[in-house]
């Protein structure tokens, strides 16, 4: 039986790993494996960017197919040997028990039989067919199995092809993320560099301001000390005068002494901490936008009569024609409108498109701040930043001051009610502009000063922020 095993090994080598049939027009790929020419071409047709071997997964750089004529000859030889083996097997097949030709086949036991094997105690009630009928039937069964297995192999090959494509897609996505990460890191480094320079500039300005104040204090003290020394010399000279002469001058001396003993005003000198924003807020802002964005809209009842509000109450424009406002407008002096909802707890984010408006103010105010607006607005009820001309200003609960920041076309506002903070960001760069720190004692609401220009101011919805 050794020659049978050798023939089986030879036949295995002549099968195509893709279709599992004898190799047709065999070709060899660069890793050394062999396939039918049509099979490997069909397999590679599903791979756009790569060409991998279905057996070893080797990435073939070039789709070079080398015809293998020698292997084709071996296949023909193996087929001839198999035919000879089949004839020899048919001629030599006999029943080992009865030494008769095996001419029958038991369908129940799937066993070859001779005429004497068909006995009641063993196969009497079984379905027994002639070897020709059984062979014909089982060839059909085997063909069905062959179709099923080939279909399964094709499915596996398709899945492998899809996974190969997924591998390519994965690499492309990873490369895209690497590029995006590089870009984001470069932006972050530029942001940090700009923030560092701006912080150092603010620190230098503060240092120079305090140095000037110190020099002013020193000059005032020097002048005061000089005056005191002059007074002391005058005192010593007065003491040397005659009694009558001395007494005639003491009145002027006492008056002069009282004036000179008043110490000059010394201005306090304390270096304040320079405001800056570094990666913590920068990286966390996207999560803030995702989790805390509110759909803020404009409260029509609070709008100045010269403000035109859109139907969806997200856009406001200054117009010279006064509008009919239901009820009594809260703001009659300034082109202001408030937003809804009001907030008395929680964290909230909203974004406002300001475009290139030359003047505007955005922030929050106490929900009842507008009640006294007709008389005199209370600056302590507001927390807002103002753009005017070419710079930002802080206006409200903190002392008014100018911010060194580039112009932004959109402003993000983040309110943390319990923490007592309202922060402003230049969008879409997510550049921190300013943070108010205070204690809120009642409801607050969004505040919008439009300015007397025709350019609109627009609120972004929660779905399109950043807008």
Curated annotation (Swiss-Prot):
Keywords: Coiled coil, Cytoplasm, Cytoskeleton, Metal-binding, Zinc, Zinc-finger. PANTHER family: E3 UBIQUITIN-PROTEIN LIGASE TRIM (PTHR24103). A zinc finger (B box-type) spans 90-131. One of its GO terms (molecular function) is zinc ion binding. May play a role in female meiosis. Zn(2+) binds at residues 95, 98, 117, 123. The lineage of its organism: Eukaryota, Metazoa, Chordata, Craniata, Vertebrata. A zinc finger (RING-type) spans 16-57. Residues 276-466 form the B30.2/SPRY domain. One of its GO terms (cellular component) is cytoplasm. This is Tripartite motif-containing protein 75. It is found in: Cytoplasm, Cytoskeleton, Spindle. One of its GO terms (biological process) is female meiosis I. Residues 168-222 form a coiled coil. Belongs to the TRIM/RBCC family. SMART domains: BBOX, PRY, RING, SPRY. Pfam families: PRY, SPRY, zf-B_box, zf-C3HC4_4. InterPro entries: B30.2/SPRY, B30.2/SPRY_sf, Butyrophylin_SPRY, ConA-like_dom_sf, PRY, SPRY/PRY_TRIM75, SPRY_dom, TRIM/RBCC.
